Amino acid sequence: MTSLPKPINCVAFDCGNSSFRTVLGTFDGTRTNMEVVLQVSHNTIEINGLYYWDILHVYEGLKQGLKEAFLRAGHIDSIGICTWGVDFGFLDENGFLLANPLCYRNPIGEEQLSGLSAEEKRWVFDKTGIQNNRINSLYQLTGIKGLMPDLFGIASHMLMIPDLLSYFFTGEKFTEFSIASTTQLFDVKSMQYAEDVFDRFAIPMKMFKPLKQHGEVIGMLKQSIADELRIPVCPVICVPSHDTACAVAAVPAMEEDFLFISSGTWSLIGTELQTPEITQEVYQRDFANEGGVFNTITLLKNSAGMHILQCIRRDLELDGKKFTWDEIVRLAQNYQGAPGLFDPNSYELFNPKNMISAIRGLMKDDNATIEKVLASTYTSLAYTYRRTVEQIQEVTGKDYSSIYIVGGGSQNAYLNQLTADLTGKKVFSGPKEATSLGNIGVQLVSHISGFGLSDIREMVRNSEPISPFHPDPQRDRQLIDVRYRDFYENQ
């Protein structure tokens, strides 16, 4: 690909809903050798009925990961930070953190969204290109303004979670394009904040910070942090700070038109476009035009993902039954009957006290075995993927031949094969560390002249194995389609 005088060492901070990790990537001019140097679990903390993120725990863990990366590599050329979307923290006028950030799984967003008329919801979509969702920052902010007026009143700056972490490391306040688009306060047509939406919901636009471009240097690591960790200062680079955008940057596609599923806590199902699709069809099908790498658009839908399976596993552990993920898959495969079908995006599954009980309730089968619950969950997820894929084809007018599944969930071969069987499309799984690879790829743009998106994807193909899954010709296509129609008509 390119000749380098020496390898480039990039550190990717990849923060998900259940863990955060520090990944060291060493690019030799052709491929990136990646190593997870530290991974730490984290969860929300419930206080007085609200769920918070322990952002200081995350920050401290990332510092320790940076130290470990330096010890292993000997030098660090740059850092990039990406996390989940929609959540944020407040700073006062002096730049001090006012409170731990609230989690999107709180009910305050739902209460605000439900108060809007159909006309208002369509107006917000037309202004931003983003679907109305209870988790969006817009509705969280509106809820906080009513629930916590004192906190909202003294907040001078609002930073999205990845930009807040970048601020901790550099002291620079900014907003990145892809994460800004998840707020539903950003106009993806003009690539600017949606001033009309700020005015309509009485949210001060001055709380939001200027935008930076991908590959741009945000600032240098604070000298005080470098001294504490006993490492040299290095630049922090503006990467797509929404983890989905980083993952899509690392989709190993060679074709221009492709489908992707970024599979993790959520399943983000979509395609990459050059311009947004803000139409009646997109609105009715509940798609979002989110910001992607280098000002592309990811037309996608947030759908339930591994969170459901993680909660099932947690419920089993609380009942004294511990299973590995391989054992979870075998339990699903052992079920010989017809799986029950349910909508994985049902509100009842958003944050239930017990996921297994909630699924049994949706299936109207209180005595369903754990094997049936798991088989039904996997099948319902795959049918949801099929439905979303068909909707993407309808709104874009394109017929896609392949689906690329990236992220941690791409390692689930059982679900990958189900997806191929139930959609009738070729599936390619991997890379598992797509978010980190995309993060590192965009960092390389700041180091290598002319390095772009096609180079990032070539680097990914050179770096990680990609596994193909083809529709099983032995499966009864007619039965698959009949069950799918039943599933579709019951939604």
Cite the ranges covered by each PLM segment.
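N-terminal glycine/serine-rich phosphate-binding loop of ATP-dependent small-molecule kinases
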Residues: 1-99, 126, 226-236, 423-425
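Short glycine-rich phosphate-binding loop at a beta-alpha junction
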Residues: 75-83, 157, 210, 395-407
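Conserved phosphate-binding loops in N-terminal lobes of ATP-dependent enzymes
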Residues: 59-80, 134-142, 149, 155-166
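Carbohydrate-associated surface elements
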Residues: 106
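Active-site core segments that coordinate phosphate-bearing ligands/cofactors
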Residues: 2-5, 12, 117-129, 139-160, ...
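Glycine-rich beta-strand-to-loop/alpha-helix junction loops that act as flexible
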Residues: 82-87, 214-215, 263-266, 402-410
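Short, basic and Ser/Thr-rich N-terminal targeting/leader segments
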Residues: 6, 16-18, 75-77, 82-84, ...
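Short beta-strand-loop/turn "lid" adjacent to the catalytic site in phosphate-handling enzymes
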Residues: 70-103, 131-135, 166-187, 210-213
